[in-house]
Amino acid sequence: MTQPSETLPNAATVGDVPASVRWSPWRAVVGFGVVSLAADMVYEGARSITGPLLASLGASAVLVGLITGAGEAMALVLRVVFGPLADRSGRYWTLTFAGYTLTAVCVPALAITPFLAGAGLAVACLLILAERAGKAVRSPAKTALLAHAAGAVGLGRGFAVHKALDQAGAVAGPLLVAGVAALAGTLWPAMAVLIVPGAAALLVLAWIRRKMPDPAVSENASAPRASTPAREAPHPRWRWRSASSLPTVFWLFAAACGAATAGLVTYGVISYHLTRDQVVPIAAVPLIYAAAMAAAALAALLSGWLFDRHGGRVLLSLPILVAVVPALAFTNSAPAAIVGVLIWGAAVGVQDSTVKALVADLVPTTTRATAYGVFAAVQGAAAIAGGTLAGALYDRSLPALIATIAAIQLTALVLLAVTLHRDHDR
């Protein structure tokens, strides 16, 4: 077979896809958006009832906090490994398929855990962690593929359309779970039905693969053949020396956001409380989560707009939002708990979007990749610590949980204020 790098591209072929079947960039962007929509239905649908599911299998609050916190940490920290791996190997599609397959398989498999007797809880914990590892495996490679498609239509518009479809799945998944759980009167059928959007995500991804060139191939093919071999560009590697050269203001900001992450109780622990204390019917738990995801989307848009106009000061709201959550979400009043969950969603929206914008402002362009890797590692460590702490304190004393998170957020607020002051003085 002729190697792509040994031939020059022509009008009929780009990379490894003939022009006659190749999709336009916009169709590829929308295609990736549909994949994310379907996959988010699977993951977010499961996330909306992780707490009640683990509780039904005999988990304590501290175990729920540990597993949900560790899952979020894995999804963040392991990207430091799989991002460079995708660039070094060029296997963007392989890693993307592998990550989505883990989600499509592990989440519906949770439906069998209630029938595994004493092993059910352990198997459920492993499946939850494996699904989150899948997120880390696919995210860097998928984002590179999306950027390859979106480059022709504008990265801003392309990523915005993709994010809108992604958020639609984050709302639709919990709504589907709520409907099935209400009809069935139990949780496992709601997990089982998620095999449908999971399979759809893989089928659409396979379809896109047939219609879109592989970046690793098309970039090699589009490069003119030189008479002498060009020196191979160095592969990205994780270097602690680069990390240690990041400015002090970045480390202050990472510490502030780490404290905010540690205090942001996972929805697993919140939903555990909502069902254990019968604050709301179990079928309402995913509905409340869907509303929180809508709040997250609105908060991300609003905080992003305010950030562009007023700078990082908008992020001072994050520790305040986080501190308010446990005081409301862990009450036995349904209206107060729902308000607490909506505030939790707003905090998630700010944390997952606008926080990352300030990172880019605090470090030189040449060290942004390193900075985002370090930032993800700090947030991951904080997620494990915070999830475990919240679960342990919930089992012992709710007032202690509320007071501890308030103290952590006061620390985050001070660190954030110092960060903004130093950034202003630079």
State where each predicted segment sits:
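Cytoplasmic helix-loop-helix junction between adjacent transmembrane helices
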Residues: L127-A168, L358
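Helix-loop boundary and gating motifs at the non-cytosolic
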Residues: P18-A73, V249-I288
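Symmetry-related core transmembrane helices of the 12-TM Major Facilitator Superfamily/SLC fold
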Residues: W188-W207, L401-V418
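C-terminal transmembrane helical hairpin of 12-TM major facilitator-type secondary transporters
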Residues: H310-V355
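Juxtamembrane intracellular "pre-TM" segments in multi-pass secondary transporters
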Residues: Q3-W26, R210-A256
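C-terminal ends and interior cores of transmembrane alpha-helices
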Residues: T101-G118, L321-N332
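Cytoplasmic membrane-interface "Motif A"-like loop-to-helix N-cap segments
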Residues: R88-T101, D308-I320
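Helix-to-loop junctions at the C-terminal end of transmembrane segments
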Residues: L78-R91, A181, L298-G311, Y394
